[in-house]
Amino acid sequence: MTEPKPAVDPADLAFILERRIGHLATADEDGAPSVVPICYALIDHDGGSTIVTPLDAKPKTVDWRDLRRVRNIAARPEVSFVVDDYAEDWSRLAWVLVRGPARLVEPATPAHSEAVEALREKYPQ
């Protein structure tokens, strides 16, 4: 019997941890794709890691609940997340792709507090 593989290879996890920006791909209820650049942090848990991203207090033209990525996740929680490095020397190009279910975390919950703490640690303001 073979051992189960981790959801993300340790080398890929290190690559993700070293970067500051990723791209989150979602799809709406009809399957139309949308991709946005995001800031993110990882939270380690006993079964693996969780990628968290803020729906922050920057001025927006809509309430955060009406953001396309939020509506898409509510309709179809399966997402893709990619972190990459571009180099003029194409032999040095690198990227890691993670796929899985996303969920929205409501403010004033322990999970929200944990996410905010992880994001503040990675992106001190």
Features from the language model and the residues they span:
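Charged, gly/pro-rich active-site loop segments
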Residues: 1-7, 64, 80, 86-125
